[in-house]
Amino acid sequence: MERLAIFPFSNLTGDAALDWVTKAGPAILAQELAGGARVLPLRASTTGIAALQYATQLLHCTFTQRNGALQIQYALEDANSHRMIATGSIDGTALFAVSALARTLDANGAHPFSTANPDAAAAWGRGEFERAVALDPDFGTAWASWIAQTAQAGKPDVAVELAGRALARASLRTPLDKAQIQLSNATLRRDGAGRAAAFTELTRLAPHESGPLLGLATIEQQARRYSAAAELYRRALAIDPRNADALNFLGYAQGESGDLEDAKKTFETYGQIQPNNALDSLGEVYFMNGRFADAEKSFAQVSARDPNFLKGAPLMKAAYAHWLGGDLPGADALMQKYLAFLSKQNDPRAVWYGAVWFYATGRQEQALAMLAKAPAEQAANMERQRAVWRGEAHIPDDLNQLRAVYQNANPAADGLPRTLYAEALVKAGKTDEARALLKLWPLPEAGSDSLLQSLMYPRYLALRKALKIQ
């Protein structure tokens, strides 16, 4: 399969009224080529971006006016040899010329754009989505753009109404646009099952596109179906090998399922793109699996490379890893370095973080003494923290509510809701379910300002002890 980088078209007409073709031309072309088995269209703004996308061919297009009609000139370049493979020109309306170019590039795989009306296509290209739909009520791409524009303008209810109108049209074009509108509709309505169904349909219609695969993988990972998520990430990476997010999320999915060797290999590959974040992610995966010495080593490497990375969070996580590895005095030394870093950055929460550390590690009196050192402007929050520690604040304990919070939490940042949910399960006599939730260790959350955060480790450790988990 050729990976075709499509650059913005260059307007050589001198007529600013045709500037819309600059971006709309590549968008139409990419849509007409999407889903084919021979050409994978990639939108690229520069040759550098095309190289990062592993493009094998580069498409350069300009357009002029000739005898009152538009003429698109194209040049297809081999990305490796920089030799021109094909050149030519096509006359007609923008829509006609781009569609003809799509068929030239992939005679068997190209499919028609979602409107055959050149005026509707022009209105869409200029951003006049409502007018485009009025000119062609079955113009799926225009509906999708109108829905997205409305949602981004802060009108989700109106966007849902537009999606309903579009989906009510039995003759809406095309199946790909319909699936995209179904995805937008489900997202706006917070319909998880609808989102999964839409992503599944998009992966069927455009199997060589990485976006739908990544969307579906994220849903599987959120549902803690890690093996299914990992398989989807691998499929996406087969299409886009240097997709940093896919590599990072794949590493987490592998680690969350306990497959540490494969996770390490994935993060090593990811490290070629984002070395510090890859090391930090590897440290978190080790931490979750109770490999505290390995976790600390990764966090320490990140901190040594760049003390400011993630506002010093790797150093904080190294302290927690060192403590859970069995050396509290050594962990205290690391935490003091982190608190000194925060103080140097004038972070007003430095004192509070120190108090949370003392409480989390079982030293309540020292935690209370630390709170007393907080600046006067933080007195109200510090009193609320004391109330939590005195047992005067309400701690969520409703089983159904905690289940919902846990299920909606990122698996790599679900420590507190997962711990509270496990507590509720134990109280309900569902110890096997609780035991499964305690398999992975919760990560310390840098940047969290939850007054309940300090309860996480004491309660998690108490649960493991009560359930006799080694």
Where are these regions (language model features)?
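Acidic, proline/glycine-rich low-complexity intrinsically disordered segments
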Residues: 1-298, 303-309, 314
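Alpha-helical protein-protein interaction modules
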Residues: 157, 193, 212, 222-225, ...
